[in-house]
Amino acid sequence: MASDSVHPKLRAATTLKGGDRLAFVVPKDVLDEVVEGLGGCEETVLSETVCGGILDPNEVEAWVDRATRLLRFRVDPEDLRSELPIVADGLFRLLQQVTLAGSTTAEALVVRFLRRLIELRQMLSLDVEAAFSGDPAAKGYDEIVVAYPSIRALAVHRIAHELYDYGVPLLPRVMSEYAHDRTGIDIHPGAQIGQRFFIDHGTGIVVGETAVIGNRVRIYQGVTIGATSIKNGAALRGKKRHPTIEDDVTIYAGATILGGDTVIGAGSVIGGNVWLTHSVPPGSRVMAEAPRLLVKGSEGRALVDESMDVDWNI
């Protein structure tokens, strides 16, 4: 018979409550020990930060869901009249939880944001058009609006970037990380993104804080538009660290483009898995060295042995 490995104190603390439900009662000495270890505001950076007061991420997420639903789906005037005050009040409450710069008031920012919703809706609509034009698998605009993670991520980004431009601290970042968690698309709220931006698939995409992306840009899964790494990263805060992507650029899956001085010229095509840390002129076609394709039969004889050509008519 197997020996009982449960500590006697823990076994004694286990009781049956509510019929067949097994409830666990934490021993008092264990509870006291853990509370003493976790309690207080001076032990770690984490505890000091929490004690100083932070945004409730659950409240942020609930507001983001409501605001993006309004941006994507709400068109009935009566529906909008009832929904807009709720969104406005939710934003007002969140702004009261952060420190705004100078004489800026939460009331003024909420009014400014509400007036910008019209243009934000127009920008998101152009993103939907770009997705439909760029993805032959799309059967209609409804599929894109409801099902495409890129549109969800861009709806959050358009709102988060607006608040970022107002100088609102922390809130836009929490919003962008929520979108990242839900879609796999990581766009910093500081990134400047032009019209008709098309993300295909999207998983694993990273766009950094100081990136500038022009109009009609198309990127695929696994693309990084990031910064180069240095030992003292804090020294670069507030400086241009991420690339500029000009109009009508296509960046294929797995490409990595790094550096604040890097500019991808208009109309360029960046091939899959390319690693770029320098600028390229407009109209460039950039590809990694073509891989060698080798196919062998069951007897080990080469059936195909050739370099893979790339069709740049794309």
Q: Which ranges hold each PLM region?
A:
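Left-handed beta-helix
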Residues: T183, H188-P189, G194-Q195, D200-E209, ...
